Amino acid sequence: TSPYFVPDHGVQDALTLAALRGVDVRVLIPERPDHLLVFLSAFAFLPEMIRNGVKIYRYQPGFLHQKVLLVDDHTSMVGTVNLDNRSFRLNFEVTAYIPDKIFAAAVFDMLEKDFANSRQVSQRELAERPLWRKLLSRATYLLSPVQ
């Protein structure tokens, strides 16, 4: 999960390649943003990621600020890092790497509840957005290195 999901090309490629290998890659983003430009930027590259098998969900209760990563059934990461350029290159962030099956099970349970309160974004939904929204997403994505 990441409240600000505008990863650089390396992270986009890693997520996409994992999905193409058959890994269940799910990304949870908020339904409602607190930073509109960052939120709109994500929609510039989501169609390609979804087309390649990455599952994108929007958390329906609203804004979700957690930053959590679960790998298989044994490794979790919890911290302050968003999947965006500011976190990768500018902000001072910290994330705990926790190689523990019991903790991973607790994270899994938490995420399952979050996904139960979310809806999956479809390729069709993104394709049917008005042209002005598509153009706005692309324009804001150009600003992503400085957002």
What are these regions (language model features)?
Residues 4-147:
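PLD/PLD-like phosphodiesterase catalytic module centered on the HKD motif
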